[in-house]
């Protein structure tokens, strides 16, 4: 049996920070309220989004989640992004509905809630439940053409100014967090410099750093987005944009290194 240790992370820090492999035969458990231990379960990491209201809940969608992605220079279990939506299989959907019912009947939450889980042999193993707007939600919002904050407001009985349009055939959206491969300075020719910010239009970059700013190795640099008709196409687009950033930051050389 494999385990991981997890330290409670600061609020303003990347998801997945503080998670490390743990071998009880070689390491000693720390008696510290900031630490806890989880069994490591192999499988595909996924995210599910729920919206709870007075009468029950709605499963808004699921997506594939990645962490510790080496091509994005993410260490250990650092959050690396999401792709979706993905259609859950029947047993997965049944497990998610059961979990939603347990949460609803025992805790009576209202509004948006995200759950990270491992899908192993079509069985759901919950990892973390977050009663808030989570990093994977914008992927499903962009894919489905929906505003989840509208649903969140409605769950509290607040009438939103903006009503969600009818759902259309979803696109597939990919989101990836590019981490600094080494200490870098943001150059003037970064690919996002020429992009005019417009919240109504799909953009391939977000969380854009200021030109000339210094970012240390392992810290997030920028968020990459991709949009296509299939997961395969989305993966290809994200790979291409990641390679462009590797070239920009001279991965494999000492150029643009602050040290």
Question: Residue locations for each model-derived region?
Answer:
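ATP-grasp fold ATP-binding core
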Residues: 2-21, 33-49, 60-64, 115, ...
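Short helix/loop capping segments that flank catalytic or ligand/cofactor-binding pockets
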Residues: 16-18, 60, 70-71, 137, ...
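Short acidic-glycine loop/turn motifs at beta-strand connectors
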Residues: 52-57, 119-123, 181, 228-229
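Conserved metal-phosphate-binding beta-hairpin within the catalytic cores
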Residues: 104-138, 177-181
């Amino acid at each position: 049996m494999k385990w991981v240790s997890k330290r409670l992370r600061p609020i303003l820090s990347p998801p997945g920070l503080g998670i490390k492999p743990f071998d009880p035969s070689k390491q000693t458990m720390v008696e510290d309220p900031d630490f806890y231990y989880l069994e490591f379960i192999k499988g595909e990491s996924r995210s599910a989004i729920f919206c709870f209201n007075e009468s029950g809940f709605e499963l808004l969608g699921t997506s594939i989640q990645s962490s510790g992605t080496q091509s994005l220079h993410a260490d250990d279990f650092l959050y690396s992004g999401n792709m979706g939506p993905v259609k859950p299989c029947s047993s997965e959907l049944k497990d998610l509905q059961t979990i939603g019912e347990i949460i609803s009947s025992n805790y009576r939450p209202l509004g948006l809630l995200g759950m990270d889980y491992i899908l192993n042999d079509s069985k759901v193993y919950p990892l973390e439940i977050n009663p808030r707007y989570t990093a994977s939600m914008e992927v499903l919002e962009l894919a489905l053409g929906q505003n989840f904050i509208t649903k969140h407001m409605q769950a509290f009985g607040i009438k939103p100014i903006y009503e969600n349009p009818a759902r259309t055939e979803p696109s597939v959206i990919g989101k990836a967090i590019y981490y600094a491969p080494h200490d870098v300075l943001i150059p003037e020719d970064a690919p996002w410099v020429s992009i005019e910010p417009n919240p109504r239009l799909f953009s391939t970059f977000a969380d854009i750093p200021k030109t000339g700013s210094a970012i240390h190795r392992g810290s997030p640099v920028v968020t990459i987005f991709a949009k296509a008709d299939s997961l395969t196409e989305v993966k290809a687009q994200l790979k291409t944009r990641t390679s462009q950033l590797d070239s920009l930051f001279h991965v494999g050389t000492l150029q643009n290194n602050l040290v």
